[in-house]
Amino acid sequence: MSKKSQLVFAMVAGELSGDILGAGLMAALQKTHPNARFVGIGGPRMEALGFESLFAMEELAVMGIVEVLSRLPRLLHVRASLIKSITELKPDCFIGIDAPDFNIGLELKLKAQGIKTVHYVSPSVWAWRPKRIFKIAKATNMVLSLLPFEKAFYDKHQVPCTFVGHTLADDIPLESDKACARQVLELDQEAEYLAILPGSRGGELKQLAEPFVKAALLIKQQFPDIRFVTPLVNQKRREQFEQALKDHAPDLEIHMVEGKSREVMAAADGILLASGTATLEAMLIKRPMVVAYRVSPLTYSIAKRMMQVNRFSLPNLLAGCDVVPELIQHDCTPEKIAAAVGVELNRDFAPIKAEFERLHQVLRCDASQKAAEAVLALVDFKEVN
């Protein structure tokens, strides 16, 4: 049992979705331990709650095998620095939030130093590179999983795992308010809108901005009155998207918003988006969607050999069947994207919406609170009077 006057947590979040999860966990821990200290790598939401970042979260926001290799020296430097700092800090627990290729190696080193470790968000070991489960078993004291089918996989391999649900399912109402979202964004209440989300990372926009913009041109031909709205996570991504628009569709009007991706999706009649956490958010908001994604040819070639599943998007993985169209790599073309969007906007959405509602209830578990309880049980903290 840990007996001290203050709980100390080291945490590393690797991207925007990890920042959201980290902030939720911090807030839940602060309810019972308001003086707890949090140190490591976090984003703006975590920092707003008092998180002490040793490096910018952007350092870890790289995608694809090839892209990671080009940044490897810097990533190794960051990890070595974190190992030194966290070992000296001697926190009650280290919590790695997603970013498994970075965090699991870090957890392995810290656990060897006697520090309790938690991995928040199960790596997709059930989908590809399943042998990672053995490294995870050595590296972590506990995995916090967001998806219900993951716990069975860990139980099978006798790795401690707690299913906590997903914070997005807790945060997003069961019925989203389109009119309110449009009012917030100052959008026309009567127009038809397609939300375009090409990702939050530079590498994603490099791959997806061009086909998404070109697809929008083709969609405009199918639906002359449709309007487009795109949320960009920051000014850098906005400039990147604006350049793609200038290069490939200079006469196309796309309303751009900084941040507010959830409001943009809620305001839309349909969504075109990159594969990733945003697909879960779109499912919870319950809008027709088309998921498209591509990476560098080498990254895809390597990943394809390792894949254990034939679905990529979270709605399809959760449903166990194809409820939304996926256009991956060679299928991620303007023509195929535009055709798929046309089908989704014209089809009867009611059966798909009903499935989205069912999945929303499954994931709605007060995730941050459950995660905090699991972490505190692991730490077994007792205050000194």
From Swiss-Prot:
It catalyses: a lipid X + a UDP-2-N,3-O-bis[(3R)-3-hydroxyacyl]-alpha-D-glucosamine = a lipid A disaccharide + UDP + H(+). Keywords: Glycosyltransferase, Lipid A biosynthesis, Lipid biosynthesis, Lipid metabolism, Transferase. The keyword Transferase applies. GO terms for molecular function: lipid-A-disaccharide synthase activity; phospholipid binding. Its EC number is 2.4.1.182. GO terms for biological process: lipid A biosynthetic process. It is an enzyme of class 2 (transferase). Transmembrane segments: none annotated. Pathway: Bacterial outer membrane biogenesis; LPS lipid A biosynthesis. Pfam families: LpxB (PF02684). The keyword Acetylation does not apply. Condensation of UDP-2,3-diacylglucosamine and 2,3-diacylglucosamine-1-phosphate to form lipid A disaccharide, a precursor of lipid A, a phosphorylated glycolipid that anchors the lipopolysaccharide to the outer membrane of the cell. PANTHER family: LIPID-A-DISACCHARIDE SYNTHASE, LIPID-A-DISACCHARIDE SYNTHASE, MITOCHONDRIAL-RELATED. HAMAP family: LpxB. This is Lipid-A-disaccharide synthase. It comes from Shewanella oneidensis (strain ATCC 700550 / JCM 31522 / CIP 106686 / LMG 19005 / NCIMB 14063 / MR-1).
